[in-house]
């Protein structure tokens, strides 16, 4: 009889971040669970940071991936929202306490006991592994319905990148009045989605970048209204005080002062890029211009479902490069160089093939340790 708990994926075993085949176990499908056969999984920049331990809290082995689209193959007896055969998604979080102030406000992403899809532990102590694998078992409250008309492959990155830009647009008032001016700093995996969603909300969008390399693409294909090169001092001077909002997606070290100068009085800058080192925060421009700096971390489950419906309605998807699982390490190398337009997505179902040289991951919940062995 086939072991229904067996799973297969690609894991990083140390800070080199090199991914290799792994066999491991998923928990049995419980009464509140949905088992998902993974079809596609997006490659997020945070996957790269985590497998290389850039943030200092990685626990190996790690199977990354939190932009998952697949098919429900089993549902628990208490699950009424989903049925076998449904197309579903799993994003950045797969658990929370369900009782704190944040959870009661549909902000599970800010729950102090939030459980992430990978490099995290569930309440029973088991290590969670992500979507660079063939199957995942998730509490139904953290499973999303993929709307008709939203492609499985190019829709997958919306489960992280999409909600990461959608949520702050709603919270910081960017959607209340069309015609407001939004600056998007950085045109990468987050930035190109921010342009599309911003335009769908009726904003006038300016892409802010260090070079003019992507100018025509940003305007002609992505729909941006204008393009501002930060190294062009004359254009930067002309743009002072013209923007109501800026979404800063850049995860590399950069100066905030030039961005503050672009904001109108009472303008808002929302930082989304997760940097390894803190940025300098100039206070004078904030005080003298009543300007605001804020942050945002993905979104709750209700808002994420809302975002998916919004993107389906407006035909918003990520621009992707579809890759095989065996190409993941070279894709990570390219991601470091920003050599992708604009998101890698792994064709899991058609390329994840077991190998006889793979390792077995055995998890010992009682002691909270993992032991690997060859087979």
Swiss-Prot record:
EC number: 1.1.1.195
Pfam families for the chain: ADH_N, ADH_zinc_N
CDD domains from the UniProt entry: CAD1
Bound cofactor: record note: Binds 2 Zn(2+) ions per subunit.
Biological processes annotated in GO: lignin biosynthetic process
PROSITE patterns: ADH_ZINC
Keywords of this entry: Lignin biosynthesis, Metal-binding, NADP, Oxidoreductase, Zinc
SUPFAM superfamilies associated with the record: GroES-like, NAD(P)-binding Rossmann-fold domains
Protein residues bound to Zn(2+) 1: 44, 66-67, 160
Annotated residues for binding of NADP(+): 46, 164, 186-191, 209-214, 249, 273, 296-298
Annotated catalysed reactions: (E)-cinnamyl alcohol + NADP(+) = (E)-cinnamaldehyde + NADPH + H(+); (E)-coniferol + NADP(+) = (E)-coniferaldehyde + NADPH + H(+); (E)-sinapyl alcohol + NADP(+) = (E)-sinapaldehyde + NADPH + H(+); (E)-4-coumaroyl alcohol + NADP(+) = (E)-4-coumaraldehyde + NADPH + H(+)
Keyword Transport: no
Gene3D superfamilies linked to this entry: Medium-chain alcohol dehydrogenases, catalytic domain, NAD(P)-binding Rossmann-like Domain
Chain positions recorded as Zn(2+) 2 binding sites: 97, 100, 103, 111
Molecular function in Gene Ontology: cinnamyl-alcohol dehydrogenase activity; coniferyl-alcohol dehydrogenase activity; zinc ion binding
Superkingdom: Eukaryota
Pathway: Aromatic compound metabolism; phenylpropanoid biosynthesis
Function: Involved in lignin biosynthesis. Catalyzes the final step specific for the production of lignin monomers. Catalyzes the NADPH-dependent reduction of coniferaldehyde, 5-hydroxyconiferaldehyde, sinapaldehyde, 4-coumaraldehyde and caffeyl aldehyde to their respective alcohols.
Subunit annotation: Homodimer.
Protein name, as recorded: Cinnamyl alcohol dehydrogenase 3
Native species: Arabidopsis thaliana
Gene: CAD3
């Amino acid at each position: 009889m086939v072991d229904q708990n067996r799973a297969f994926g690609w894991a990083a075993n140390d800070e080199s971040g090199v991914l290799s085949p792994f066999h491991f176990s998923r928990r049995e499908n419980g009464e509140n669970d949905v088992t998902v056969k993974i079809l596609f999984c997006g490659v997020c920049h945070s996957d790269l940071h985590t497998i290389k331990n850039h943030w200092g809290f990685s626990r190996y082995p790690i199977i990354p991936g939190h932009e998952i689209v697949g098919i429900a193959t089993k549902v628990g007896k208490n699950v009424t929202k989903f049925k076998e055969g449904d197309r579903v998604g799993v994003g950045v979080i797969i658990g929370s306490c369900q009782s704190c102030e944040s959870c009661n406000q549909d902000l599970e992403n800010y729950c102090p006991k939030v459980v992430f899809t990978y490099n995290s532990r569930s309440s029973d102590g088991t290590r969670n592994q992500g979507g660079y694998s063939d199957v995942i078992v998730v509490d139904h409250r953290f499973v999303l319905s993929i709307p008709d008309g939203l492609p499985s492959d190019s829709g997958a990155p919306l489960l992280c990148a999409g909600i990461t830009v959608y949520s702050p647009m709603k919270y910081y008032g960017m959607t209340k009045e069309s015609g407001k001016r939004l600056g998007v700093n950085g045109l990468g995996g987050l930035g190109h989605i921010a342009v599309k969603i911003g335009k769908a909300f009726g904003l006038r969008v300016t892409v802010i970048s260090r070079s003019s390399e992507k100018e025509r693409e940003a305007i002609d294909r992505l729909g941006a209204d204008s393009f501002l090169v930060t190294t062009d001092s004359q254009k930067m001077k002309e743009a002072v005080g013209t923007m109501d909002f800026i979404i800063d997606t850049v995860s590399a070290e950069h100066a905030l002062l030039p961005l503050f100068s672009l904001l109108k009085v009472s303008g808002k800058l929302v930082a989304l890029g997760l940097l390894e080192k803190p940025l300098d925060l100039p206070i004078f421009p904030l005080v003298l211009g009543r300007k605001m700096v804020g942050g945002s971390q993905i979104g709750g489950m209700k808002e994420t479902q809302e975002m998916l419906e919004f993107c389906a309605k407006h035909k918003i998807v990520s621009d992707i490069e579809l890759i095989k699982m065996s190409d993941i390490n070279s894709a990570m190398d390219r991601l470091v160089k920003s050599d992708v337009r604009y998101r890698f997505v792994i064709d899991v179902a058609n390329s994840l093939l077991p190998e006889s040289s793979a390792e077995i991951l055995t998890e010992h919940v009682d002691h909270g340790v993992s032991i690997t062995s060859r087979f």
